[in-house]
């Protein structure tokens, strides 16, 4: 239901980054094609949309964590790992970093706004 109502609004306003929780895992979408993938979790049906430039992240910081079945719908996964995020803005660039509870960098990407074009997703090498 949330996807049905929120996704069109997020697309209309070209939202850069969607942060959510309550899945008890860490997962982040990336530049992937989800049109032919089966059994995609609810929050990832549209994953990263290169025509819009939205990235979706779900994270966990509490003690309750689940194992995850890795799928093609997310670029980066973590299970049984508490994470926190730091987001920096510098002009037209959003930098996202996810760290483990012990301070180890786990995930990083940048979103670069481009006038008249979708955001450019710049992946860090892991």
Residue ranges and their predicted role:
Residues 1-105:
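Long, structured stretches of catalytic cores involved in phosphate-ester chemistry, encompassing
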């Amino acid at each position: 239901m949330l996807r049905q109502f929120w996704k069109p609004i997020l697309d209309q306003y070209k939202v850069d980054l969607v942060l959510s929780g309550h899945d008890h895992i860490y997962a982040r979408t990336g530049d992937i094609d989800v049109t032919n993938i089966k059994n995609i979790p609810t929050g990832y049906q549209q994953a990263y949309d290169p025509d819009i430039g939205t990235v979706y992240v779900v994270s966990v910081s509490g003690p309750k964590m689940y194992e995850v079945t890795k799928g093609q719908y997310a670029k980066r996964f973590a299970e049984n790992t508490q994470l926190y995020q730091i987001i920096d803005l510098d002009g037209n660039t959003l930098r996202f970093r996810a760290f483990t509870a012990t301070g180890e960098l786990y995930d990083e990407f940048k979103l670069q706004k481009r006038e008249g074009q979708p955001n450019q997703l710049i992946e860090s090498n892991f």
